[in-house]
Amino acid sequence: MAEQELRNYHLNFGPQHPAAHGVLRLVLELDGEVVERVDPHIGLLHRGTEKLIEYKTYLQATPYFDRLDYVAPMNQEHAFVLAAERLLGLEVPRRAQFIRVLYSEIGRILAHLLNVTTQAMDVGALTPPLWGFEEREKLMIFYERASGARLHANYFRTGGVHRDLPPKLLEDIYNFCDPCSQVLDDLEGLITDNRIFKQRNVDIGVVSQEEALEWGFSGVMVRGSGMAWDLRRAQPYEVYSELDFDIPVGKNGDCYDRYLCRMEEMRQSLRIMKQCIELMPGGPVHVLDGKVVPPSRSEMKRSMEALIHHFKLYTEGYHVPAGEVYAAVEAPKGEFGVYLVSDGGNKPYKCKIRAPGYAHLQAMDHLCKGHMLADVSAILGSIDIVFGEVDR
């Protein structure tokens, strides 16, 4: 009898796969149904963001950050404006800092709600996304009332925020917090103890603390493994050092623990939002330096100097002192960092973006090895990939 050669099966997962969360292409090598190798192919959404920013003024560069992790846009803007402010040596007014923290936490809930519910959908639960998106819709309206846009807000500016919040908005956000907490309880009742959900996520994609550090993980990917590392506590920025909140950590570092961390983080975000509204001071929402922040419309109607400032800011932009700085924020997906180099001109010399999802996706081979084919989508769902920031 002739000898038969056994070969592994190669399978393309994506780029149009419903569980791929965007334009991901994975080339899987399977032995039967067991995954032997995972080869992620990225770059299908590459738009050259870092290079484009080098040809734009600092004011024009901010909207590019909305388009990275487009699930929680303001968190990305935050890192860029922090970097520019450190180079300029600006002190942001306290009201602006509280507004930024408030909207960063709204962004965290937006991202986690999407992730938790789609993670459940990836393993077969169809109801959670319908409940989660109802709450996301309310948060999108808060985005819209502050900035005029539901998604690409362009609200954080160097020196503060674009404009003050409209009346009654803070009251509406405060009234949203308690009912939202109830919705989170309902969601947990639906999936936390669900037998099928646990079978699909417990002990799947386990990451130890050492592995998390070696792969450069951040955010929920390290906290799920038991490390209480959160930049809001470790390197406090804005007013986080004044706020009271807990950092949820997991024990086993598997998909299920990461899900539980995200659920608890949303509750902590609601706590932070309520504190921000209770402690919100009065005063200006951006620095009063006319060389950096455009004047108000009413001022431009009265003052020729204000009109000149406005014209200069929107044509030439402001010049940033030469130097380099790295600013990182705790984005929903992990440590989102911006390494900004200025040569003293009105455009960044170099802007390197450190996207958390990039480090997480590179470990797909390590995470999936030895698991079943069906577990690939569960692992992918739990590492929370958005392709805007991975490919940028």
From Swiss-Prot:
Subcellular location(s) per record: Cell inner membrane
Catalytic activity: a quinone + NADH + 5 H(+)(in) = a quinol + NAD(+) + 4 H(+)(out)
Annotated GO MF terms: NAD binding; NADH:ubiquinone reductase (non-electrogenic) activity; quinone binding
Keyword check for Magnesium: no
Class in the EC hierarchy, top level: translocase
Pfam families (alphabetical): Complex1_49kDa
Documented EC number(s): 7.1.1.-
UniProt keyword annotations, A-Z: Cell inner membrane, Cell membrane, Membrane, NAD, Quinone, Translocase, Transport, Ubiquinone
Any one GO cellular component localisation term in the record: plasma membrane
Membrane topology, record value: Peripheral membrane protein
Family: Belongs to the complex I 49 kDa subunit family.
Complex formation: NDH-1 is composed of 14 different subunits. Subunits NuoB, C, D, E, F, and G constitute the peripheral sector of the complex.
Function comment: NDH-1 shuttles electrons from NADH, via FMN and iron-sulfur (Fe-S) centers, to quinones in the respiratory chain. The immediate electron acceptor for the enzyme in this species is believed to be ubiquinone. Couples the redox reaction to proton translocation (for every two electrons transferred, four hydrogen ions are translocated across the cytoplasmic membrane), and thus conserves the redox energy in a proton gradient.
Record's protein name: NADH-quinone oxidoreductase subunit D
Gene for this chain: nuoD
